[in-house]
């Protein structure tokens, strides 16, 4: 025997079964590790989809800005979508009714259901004119409504308003729990209604602008850039913390906990 390397084939023959078991254990460990982190990733992805369906696919909400400021923000290259949102009669006590049932009047634009809440649109399209409206499925079912039908909204101070239905929206838990219909109008029409009616002393016209960034790789940096460049304070900007947490772009530790659990399982596999 001239070299120690000559022992390798001899050892391989003697320990053939042991070598096969070692290879099997290594392959099994790799499979388990891949499965663990794959399941963690699938869980995070499923939670992101669920959260986007429940709370909307928006990253921040901005309030107390003018429509001109909103237009500037919407034109930024790092903003994929911006949708205004306002509600009258959210508490169901201001006297806006449809067929004697209180309604929450919501004002926005077509990007609300195209980008921010894409899963809420069940049929039709967002109103293109001030004379059109969308209603929730509860109103459709109770009043046997169809696209193209006319509905009449009674107001507390002004005359009744007639709208042509352009589509239907999924019910929300808040509206269902309060036995209230939801009616969606253009932003301009809702503001006109606000000016026409007393609104029981409602002060101001607070509009929230939902913002969806084009990239989610560094949302916190984009938020800070938006604040500094547009002169926004921390009180004006609110985050969709649940969604950002799942995307790893929030101080929320949920996603970190999921991957930490996967890492612990990985260590256990190594020791096994």
Where are these regions (language model features)?
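Feature of multi-pass inner-membrane transport and sensor proteins
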Residues: 1-21
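Alpha-helical membrane and juxtamembrane elements of multi-pass inner-membrane transport
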Residues: 2, 6, 241-248, 258-264
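Hydrophobic alpha-helical transmembrane segments of multi-pass inner-membrane transport and secretion
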Residues: 16-44, 251-272
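Basic-flanked hydrophobic alpha-helices used for secretion and membrane insertion
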Residues: 41-248
């Amino acid at each position: 025997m001239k070299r120690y390397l000559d022992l390798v084939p001899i050892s391989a023959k003697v320990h053939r079964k042991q070598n096969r078991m070692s290879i099997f254990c290594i392959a099994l460990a790799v499979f388990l590790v891949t499965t663990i982190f794959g399941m963690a990733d699938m869980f995070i992805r499923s939670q992101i989809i669920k959260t986007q369906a429940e709370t909307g696919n928006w990253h921040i909400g901005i309030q107390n800005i003018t429509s001109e400021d909103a237009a500037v923000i919407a034109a930024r290259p790092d903003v994929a979508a911006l949708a205004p949102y306002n509600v009258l009669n959210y508490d169901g006590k201001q006297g806006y009714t449809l067929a004697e049932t209180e309604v929450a009047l919501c004002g926005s634009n077509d990007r609300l259901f195209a980008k921010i809440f894409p899963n809420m649109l069940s049929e039709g399209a967002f109103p293109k004119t001030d004379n059109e409206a969308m209603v929730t499925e509860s109103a459709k079912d109770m009043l046997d409504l169809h696209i193209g039908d006319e509905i009449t909204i009674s107001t507390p101070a002004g005359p009744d308003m007639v709208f042509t239905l352009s589509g239907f929206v999924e019910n929300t838990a808040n509206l269902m729990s309060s036995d209230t219909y939801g009616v969606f109008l253009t932003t301009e029409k809702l503001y006109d209604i606000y000016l026409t009616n007393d609104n029981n002393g409602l002060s101001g016209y607070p509009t929230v602008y939902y913002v969806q960034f084009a990239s989610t790789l560094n949302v916190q940096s984009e938020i800070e850039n938006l604040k500094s460049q547009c002169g926004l304070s921390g009180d004006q900007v609110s985050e969709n913390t649940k969604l950002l947490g799942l995307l790893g772009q929030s101080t929320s530790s949920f996603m970190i906990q999921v991957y930490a659990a996967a890492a612990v399982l990985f260590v256990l596999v190594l020791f096994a």
